[in-house]
């Protein structure tokens, strides 16, 4: 992020607490904005895949000549990525302008960091008179700011264990939190083959139009789409199912041809991103690690794998790395990369009983140098966190003399 925007966020927002709060104060501030809502709002939640789905739906709209505002989190390179218009990041000046507007509103002092950012996005979208808003839930659903709106379509891509300290210890606990984005008489699309009871109960209670793999007969096109991507695992079955169902339930009715085109051509950075012989994937929970290993078995048989790992402070590195036993002998652990990532010594302490040769790497520079000298027939895996993926991408772009932007990432493939 350029200095001006970065400095303002650091001084005015980063000291705001991240604690999950009731939405009462948020809804009061939101109401004061008197927003004019678009023709359609799509609200996308889920443990894994919601960011990918948000990008794909945005691309469907963009290629249909619709104006679309997209709100996602977290970001890889710059804060600006969280707010996009027709797939393009918000400019620094406009972002700062709307952040200041929200910060100066009455009652905004009690809002947390994420609530301020989301209000700035909605206020900006409102000024542009867009056709469609694509809004990603940050975590859970019940207390997410975007749940203050009235979506036309709600989506839960998949429910898996993650953020248990906030959402609960079981799949059903987490599903109950996510189910709160459902609306009466409106479509609730669920990508999981097995729909948790908490979601079934919520949908039944409020009479949502539940659309899932268990209760929806697949069209020939959808069957072929799922089969096509099952060979590579590049996009999960859950995401593809949700994308197809959104396209058919949306008032804009996106074509099958466009679904296929967008699915094949949209670059999902930090999600199985293969650049040369380096795979950058932000897998950061047990479910996404399983998907990554499936992808490795399908695409990198008999290849030597170099695993570079760093995870967020709240994660359990033991659970994330144990599935690689028997597949990888040594793991390069990244340290001093980002202040949200777990210190090296703590990772080692939590993984001491795993059967790996751990090698400490004290900077992103050291990791990048190791990747650069790897042999062409080796595959480097950069995994464990969006923060880790983002820092690696930044170093890669700097090394090639490219600006830190998503459009620059598109040039790397």
Language-model-derived ranges and their functions:
Residues 47, 68, 134, 157, ...:
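Residue-level signal for inorganic ion chemistry
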Residues 19, 23, 27-30, 34-39, ...:
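ATP-dependent carboxylate-amine ligase catalytic core
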Residues 57, 139-152, 393-397:
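Short Gly/Thr/Asp-enriched flexible loops that form oxyanion-binding sites at enzyme active sites
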Residues 42-43, 52-69:
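A conserved segment at the C-terminal end of the G1
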């Amino acid at each position: 992020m350029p200095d001006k925007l970065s400095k303002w966020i650091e001084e005015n927002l980063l000291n705001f607490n991240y604690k999950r709060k009731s939405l009462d104060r948020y809804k009061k501030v939101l109401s004061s904005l008197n927003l004019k809502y678009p023709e359609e709002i799509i609200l996308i939640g889920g443990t894994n895949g919601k960011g990918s789905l948000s990008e794909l739906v945005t691309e469907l709209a963009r290629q249909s000549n619709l104006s679309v505002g997209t709100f996602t989190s977290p970001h890889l390179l710059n804060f600006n990525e969280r707010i996009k218009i027709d797939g393009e990041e918000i400019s620094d000046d406009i972002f700062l302008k709307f952040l200041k507007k929200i910060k100066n509103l009455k009652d905004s002092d009690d809002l947390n960091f994420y609530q301020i950012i989301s209000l700035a996005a909605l206020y900006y979208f409102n000024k542009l008179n867009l056709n469609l808003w694509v809004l990603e839930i940050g975590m859970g659903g019940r207390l997410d700011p975007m749940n203050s709106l009235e979506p036309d379509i709600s989506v839960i891509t998949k429910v898996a264990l993650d953020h248990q300290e906030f959402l609960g210890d079981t799949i059903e606990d987490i599903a109950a939190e996510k189910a709160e984005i459902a609306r009466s008489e409106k479509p609730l699309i669920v990508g999981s083959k097995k729909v948790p009871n908490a979601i079934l109960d919520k949908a039944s209670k409020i009479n949502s139009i539940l659309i899932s793999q268990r209760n929806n007969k697949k069209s020939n096109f959808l069957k072929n789409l799922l089969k096509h991507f099952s060979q590579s695992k590049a996009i999960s079955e859950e995401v593809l199912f949700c994308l197809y169902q959104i396209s058919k339930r949306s008032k804009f009715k996106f074509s099958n041809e466009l679904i296929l085109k967008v699915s094949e051509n949209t670059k999902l950075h930090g999600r199985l991103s293969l650049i040369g012989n380096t795979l950058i994937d932000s897998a950061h929970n047990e479910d996404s690690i399983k998907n990554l290993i499936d992808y490795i078995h399908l695409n990198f048989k008999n290849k030597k794998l170099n695993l570079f790992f760093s995870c967020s402070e709240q994660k359990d590195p033991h659970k994330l790395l144990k599935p690689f036993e028997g597949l990888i002998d040594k793991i390069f652990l990244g340290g001093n990369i980002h202040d949200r990532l777990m210190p090296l010594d703590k990772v080692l302490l939590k993984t001491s009983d795993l059967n790996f040769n751990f090698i400490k790497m004290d900077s992103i520079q050291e990791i990048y140098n190791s990747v650069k000298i790897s042999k062409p027939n080796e595959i480097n895996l950069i995994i464990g966190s969006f923060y880790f993926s983002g820092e690696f991408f930044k170093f890669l772009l700097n090394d090639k003399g490219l600006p830190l932007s998503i459009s620059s990432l598109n040039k790397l493939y």
